[in-house]
């Protein structure tokens, strides 16, 4: 029986900032938040912090977002390793073209023991889950049989790697959209804000909305000044959404 894969979002990289010598400026932040402030001040050479309301890093970034000077958010980035997400959801995820992706390859990785992601609409209904898992088991059995026959068909191919790849790329056609995949995603702060605004909305598919909420929780720990304007709330059906009055690029 297919194993269920839980969603997991792991922070694996974030921007480090190194202040250039000779610039008469200091800040109360570090990393990507410091870089964001530096980039903004570089536009106007406002190193002396003449405005008390923007003298702190948080105050400065809040002002930047409020006035829509989003380009300075593009310098800092965050990378996540995401697992427990379905192929169906990553087809939506990769539509965000300002992200960079590296995803598990079904041509090189055999999927006969792959886990699956239960669609949110099934989770609270044991009968639907049973129907779903039965269908998944049947498709995996078909995949395994096709893989075996295709490997035999391509047995004359002397390159073992190519032989296996040819078999897997054909057999994967019967795998369900619910098959778990794993993916590395890198994006700058502006791209992540746009993703959260679009996909943490109540109008988004529930699975990718859960991903957006999980990413937001990590992003707030990395750069609170950039992402803490998003507020997470719970809908009547128990699912979560995140909204911000400053998310104007959705």
UniProtKB/Swiss-Prot annotation:
**Which coenzymes or cofactors are required?**
FAD
Per its record, the protein catalyses: dUMP + (6R)-5,10-methylene-5,6,7,8-tetrahydrofolate + NADPH + H(+) = dTMP + (6S)-5,6,7,8-tetrahydrofolate + NADP(+)
Alphabetical keyword list = FAD, Flavoprotein, Methyltransferase, NADP, Nucleotide biosynthesis, Transferase
Pfam families associated with the record: Thy1
Superkingdom of the source? Bacteria
Sorted alphabetically, the Gene Ontology BP terms of this entry are: dTMP biosynthetic process; dTTP biosynthetic process; methylation
Question: A Gene Ontology MF term for this entry?
Answer: NADPH binding
Residue ranges of the motif ThyX motif: 95-105
Cofactor binding note from Swiss-Prot or TrEMBL:
Binds 4 FAD per tetramer. Each FAD binding site is formed by three monomers.
EC annotation? 2.1.1.148
Pathway terms, separated by semicolons: Pyrimidine metabolism; dTTP biosynthesis
CDD domains attached here? ThyX
Disulfide bridge map: none
Q: Does the keyword Transmembrane apply?
A: no
Task: Give the annotated active site.
Answer: 199
**Which amino acids does the record list as binding dUMP?**
92-95, 103-107, 172, 199
Q: Which residues bind FAD?
A: 71, 95-97, 103, 188-190, 194
The job of this chain, per UniProt, is described as:
Catalyzes the reductive methylation of 2'-deoxyuridine-5'-monophosphate (dUMP) to 2'-deoxythymidine-5'-monophosphate (dTMP) while utilizing 5,10-methylenetetrahydrofolate (mTHF) as the methyl donor, and NADPH and FADH(2) as the reductant.
What PANTHER family has UniProt attached to this entry?
Answer: FLAVIN-DEPENDENT THYMIDYLATE SYNTHASE
State the family named in the UniProt similarity comment for this chain. Belongs to the thymidylate synthase ThyX family.
This protein is called Flavin-dependent thymidylate synthase
Native species: Mycolicibacterium smegmatis (strain ATCC 700084 / mc(2)155)
Gene, per the UniProt record: thyX
